[in-house]
Amino acid sequence: MKRNLYLLLAVFGFLCCVGQLFTVAAHNNGYHTRNIFTPETIPWGPVPPFINPGAQLAVLEGDPTASTGDYTVRLKMPDGYKIAPHWHPLRENVTVLSGTFKVGMGDQFDTKKMAAFTEGSFAFLDPDMHHYAMACGQTIVQVHGQSPLQFNYVNPDDDPSRRR
C-alpha cells in the first residue's frame, strides 16, 4: 500500500513536470507573444504633447493615461534632448537601457548639477520630486510607474503642449 502511494506520487509529479514543459513550449511558440517585445518589435511612436517633440515613446504595458493601473514605457531620445524641470504626483522608476541619461534635482535646469546615469543604472523618484533630464548620445530609458502619468512643469511655459 505504501509502495503504491509512492508510485502514485511519483507519477503525479512526473505529469506535473510534463505539463509545465508543454506550457513553456506553448509560450515559446508564440501563443503569448503580445506580452513579449524584442528590439525589432517595440512599437515606437511620437511622444505625447506634454513631452518635447523629437523623442519617441513606446508603451509596453498598461496605459499611462488610464486613471489607475501600472504602465511601462520606453523613451528614445536623440543626443542633447532635454526635459525641463518638472514633477510627477506618483512615483516613477527609471532604468537606463542605452546611452547616458543625465538627471538633476531642483527647479532650475543646471547641467553642472546633473548626475550621469549610464546603461544599467536605475533610479526611483518619489512623488513631487522636482527633477530635469538630458540625453547624452542616443539614449533609451524604460519608465515604470502607476497611472496616470502626469508631467507638472515647474515653469508652466516649459510645457510643450502649450506651444503646439
Where are these regions (language model features)?
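Positively charged n-region of N-terminal signal peptides that target proteins for export
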Residues: M1-N4
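Bacterial N-terminal signal peptides
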Residues: L8-Q20
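A short, N-terminal "cap"/entry segment at the start of jelly-roll beta-barrel domains
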Residues: V24-G69, P156-R164
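Double-stranded beta-helix
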Residues: T33-N35, K112, M134-R164
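N-terminal post-signal-peptidase region of extra-cytosolic proteins
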Residues: L57-E61, V73-Y81, P85
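Glycine- and acidic-residue-biased ligand/ion/polar-headgroup-sensing regions
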Residues: P78-Y81, H88-Q108
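Short acidic-glycine-tyrosine-enriched beta hairpin
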Residues: G80, D107-D128
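Short beta-strand His + acidic residue motifs that chelate non-heme Fe in jelly-roll/DSBH
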Residues: I83-P85, V103-G104, L125, H130-C136
